[in-house]
Amino acid sequence: MRKGAHLIIGILAFFCYAYLLSFIQETTGASFVPGLFAVITGSIMPDILEVPTSWRHRGIFHSRRALKCMVGTFGITAATGFLPSPLIPHAVLVYGISCFALGYLFHLLADATTKRGLPE
């Protein structure tokens, strides 16, 4: 898949996540912009770590293990995002990590739909 497709998928996932999160807590520009930057970075990070110069570029950063790690990371950070802000000392950082994991996760899910899929 091309970088542009990964970016569009990641940004769409981010807008859905930000929309759902806005029902629980107030989202301001102070957290929206870093979250958008984090999801853009996460959406292209697997291809930065493993440059797609050959047909064998899918290694550990494009694997099912990486997918499981990102599901866990997103799940934990997103769940803590639903707690009231005073309970989380670095709420914007946790939100940024969850957005990065969301972008990475959707990159891997998009790659999983291709013919080659994801390696073990």
Identify what each model region corresponds to.
Residues 1-120:
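N-terminal membrane-targeting hydrophobic helices
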